[in-house]
Amino acid sequence: MAKIYKFLVSVFFLIIYGKIKIGKLRDVKTIDLKYKSIYKFKLYILKKGRIFTDCVTNVAYIQNNQIIPKISYQQNKHYISSIKYNSTLINGTPKFKKYYRGKVLSLVQGASGNNYWHWLFDIVPKIELLNANKILKKIDYFYVPNINQYVVDTFKIFNINKEKLIESQTNKHFEADEIYGLEHLYIKKGAFQKQFKNLPKWIVKFINKKFLKFKKK
C-alpha cells in the first residue's frame, strides 16, 4: 500500500513540475572566486532555479528541469555517487515548491550539514568564500540544513540576521529568482568516511583564526 501511495504521489508531482533530466554545466552562469589569491573556486548561479532535497542523501540543483552536475549531491550506500543516482531523476520533485524573490545561497549537502563538525568545516568556509569576494552582502537568503543556535551564532559573526535563513527541513523544494551554489570544497567521489583526509589546510587555518577568539575562557 505504501509503495502504491508513493508511486501516485510521484506521478502527481511529475504532472505538475515535469520530468528531471541531467543538464550541462555550460548552461549555468559562473563567477570565479579566489581565496588568499591562491585558491580558486567557481560560484554557480541558477536563474529561476529550483532546489529539491530529501535532507538525507540527495540535493538537486535544477534549472529548466535539468539537474546540474558538480553542485548537486547524491550519496548511495555511504558512497558519494554520480549524478545519475540522484533521486530526482527517478522520483521527480514530490513536494510543493515555495518561491523566494531575490538571491538565495544554498548551504545544504544532505544529512551531514546537521552535524556541528560538518557545519564548521564544510559549510562555514563557503560563507567565508563569498565574504572574501564581497558577494555575501548581495545575498537575500541563506538555505541552511537547520536553524539551531550554533547556526544562528555563526551568521551573527558575519552580521547576518536569523530572518534571512531558510531551513531545509521545512522547505525541501523551492524556487528563487537566483540560486547560488558551490560544489563541495573537498568531498568529491568514493566512500564518504574516507573523504576527510582531503580536508584543505586553509579551511583549518581559517576556522582557527575566525572562531578561536570566541572561545569561552
Residue ranges and their predicted role:
Residues 1-217:
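The feature primarily captures lumenal catalytic ectodomains
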